[in-house]
From Swiss-Prot:
<dbReference type="InterPro" id="IPR036621">
    <property type="entry name" value="Anticodon-bd_dom_sf"/>
</dbReference>
<dbReference type="GO" id="GO:0005524">
    <property type="term" value="F:ATP binding"/>
</dbReference>
<comment type="similarity">
    <text>Belongs to the class-II aminoacyl-tRNA synthetase family.</text>
</comment>
<dbReference type="Pfam" id="PF13393">
    <property type="entry name" value="tRNA-synt_His"/>
</dbReference>
<dbReference type="GO" id="GO:0006427">
    <property type="term" value="P:histidyl-tRNA aminoacylation"/>
</dbReference>
<dbReference type="GO" id="GO:0016740">
    <property type="term" value="F:transferase activity"/>
</dbReference>
<keyword id="KW-0648">Protein biosynthesis</keyword>
<dbReference type="InterPro" id="IPR006195">
    <property type="entry name" value="aa-tRNA-synth_II"/>
</dbReference>
<keyword id="KW-0547">Nucleotide-binding</keyword>
<keyword id="KW-0030">Aminoacyl-tRNA synthetase</keyword>
<dbReference type="Pfam" id="PF03129">
    <property type="entry name" value="HGTP_anticodon"/>
</dbReference>
<dbReference type="GO" id="GO:0005737">
    <property type="term" value="C:cytoplasm"/>
</dbReference>
<protein>
    <recommendedName>
        <fullName>Histidine--tRNA ligase</fullName>
        <ecNumber>6.1.1.21</ecNumber>
    </recommendedName>
</protein>
<dbReference type="GO" id="GO:0004821">
    <property type="term" value="F:histidine-tRNA ligase activity"/>
</dbReference>
<dbReference type="InterPro" id="IPR004516">
    <property type="entry name" value="HisRS/HisZ"/>
</dbReference>
<dbReference type="InterPro" id="IPR033656">
    <property type="entry name" value="HisRS_anticodon"/>
</dbReference>
<dbReference type="InterPro" id="IPR004154">
    <property type="entry name" value="Anticodon-bd"/>
</dbReference>
Length: 434
């Protein structure tokens, strides 16, 4: 039996990888407009980076983390999400210092790892694109990040988008709400799922996020955090809503929304679509929020942050469902056909010269007959086919055919190697004269 990829992973093959490159390039272009710069952090970190930031009660830490003891007896974890590693790098490299412009804006792309049941759009190794903006408590930064997220999805031509927002308040708001929520849930303790029983006193907000049907029934009548906001938290959330309206970004307030990671506070948001490829109803494509205590929690100063992440696999499922011609067929500038073994050195030199000039060029390496080589040129969508046979070799010329117009000319090899643009112009002029 041959070797197979691990369960929950995927090989991204040529052709498919073109789509990934398109997604990454589009994201980089959008982020550049907002002055976000790329950051690259390790695929693995100290286990504590994720347990401290994500919270011991989160599913990621308690159930899904790939962690192990390395040969130096250090507790290591493969990154399950991007934010914690970026915050660790922000703190370790003292990017919070006054010499660095604030907000300090970064984005990341790359693989993440979670041990969960593989399904469509969800793998154990999956890829995330995310952004983080550090250093400003302004609600305008929340809205800038949301606006950028909406713009990014529009660039990907995702339709039927819905923005849902909520607030988790500041520390005082959450403390008051925690108390009210615990008081509400305690009489239902025996009815709660085992996970929710554990979370009830550690982080009762996570009970609201339970997927258990009985838990969901219980929390339907739970207190709403909007009723427990401090005046400052109310002002922050109201300003976010006002600024979204000023940008004509429609939104819904979803008071039941909580994020799956424990570090969020104030504004949280999800962008959803109703495309059936991800399941029934509205499904989240991108999610994020504000995390004002996370930098301090990982050893830095008190510095606010806000960001989002999206899964690339799920995004590509959507993009392919909505647009079958996601990436245009690649075009080859020139394919060089060699007729006879003695032409090999000349055709090799020619394709290298064309590549040196910035063109895409290829030739046969399987000693195939001319007919098979011409067939390959067509398959590769070559714009021009250059043919060198015994007579061309003797005359130091080449036969060039424009595959779009069908026009053919013979030119000196030196001209072809030195100025391919002139050859194209000659072909065009001849086409116009015919």
């Amino acid at each position: 039996m041959g070797y197979q990829k691990p369960k929950g992973t995927a090989d991204i093959l040529p052709g498919e990888s073109d789509q990934w490159q398109l997604v990454e390039k589009t994201a980089r272009d959008v982020f550049a407009r907002y002055q976000f710069k790329e950051i690259r952090t390790p695929l693995f970190e100290s286990y504590d980076v994720f347990s401290r930031s994500s919270g011991d009660t989160s599913d990621i830490v308690s159930k899904e983390m790939y962690d192990f003891m390395d040969k130096g007896d250090r507790h290591i974890a493969l990154r399950p999400e991007g934010t914690a590693g970026v915050v660790r790098a922000f703190v370790e490299n003292k990017l919070y210092g006054p010499e660095h412009q604030k907000p300090y804006k970064v984005y990341y792309m790359g693989p993440m790892f979670r041990y969960e049941r593989p399904q469509s759009g969800r793998q154990r190794q999956f890829h995330q694109i995310g952004v983080e903006s550090f250093g400003s408590e302004s609600p305008a930064v929340d809205v800038e990040v949301i606006s950028m997220a909406m713009r990014l999805l529009r660039e990907f031509k995702i339709t039927d988008l819905k923005l849902a927002i909520n607030t988790l308040g500041d520390a005082a708001s959450r403390a008051a709400y925690h108390e009210a929520l615990v008081n509400y849930l305690e009489p239902h303790f025996e009815e709660l799922s085992d996970d929710s029983k554990v979370r009830l006193h550690k982080n009762p907000l996570r009970v609201l996020d339970s997927k258990d049907a009985k838990d969901q029934e219980i929390v339907k009548d739970a207190p709403v955090i909007l009723d427990y906001l401090t005046d400052e938290a109310k002002v922050h959330f109201n300003t976010v809503k006002t600024l979204l309206e000023s940008l004509n970004i429609p939104y819904e307030v979803d008071t039941e929304m909580v994020r799956g990671l424990d570090y969020y506070n104030h504004t949280i948001f999800e962008i959803m679509t109703s495309n059936k490829v991800l399941g029934r109803g509205y499904t989240t494509v991108l999610a994020g929020g504000r995390y004002n205590g996370l930098v301090e929690q990982l050893g830095g100063p008190d510095m606010p942050g806000v960001g989002f992440g999206l899964g690339v696999e799920r995004l590509l499922l959507l993009m392919n469902a909505q647009n079958s011609d996601l990436v245009a067929a690649p075009v080859l500038d020139a394919y060089v056909v060699g007729i006879g073994a003695e032409t090999s050195a000349t055709t090799l030199h020619l394709v290298e010269s064309l590549r040196e000039a910035g063109l895409t060029a290829d030739r046969d390496y399987l000693d195939r007959k001319p007919k098979a080589q011409f067939k390959t040129a067509n398959k590769l969508n070559a714009q021009f086919v250059v043919t060198i046979g015994e007579s061309e070799l003797a005359d130091k010329t080449a036969h060039v055919k424009d595959m779009t117009s069908g026009v053919e000319i013979t030119v000196p090899l030196t001209t072809l190697e030195a100025d391919f643009a002139a050859v194209k112009n000659e072909l065009k002029a001849q086409e116009e004269n015919e």
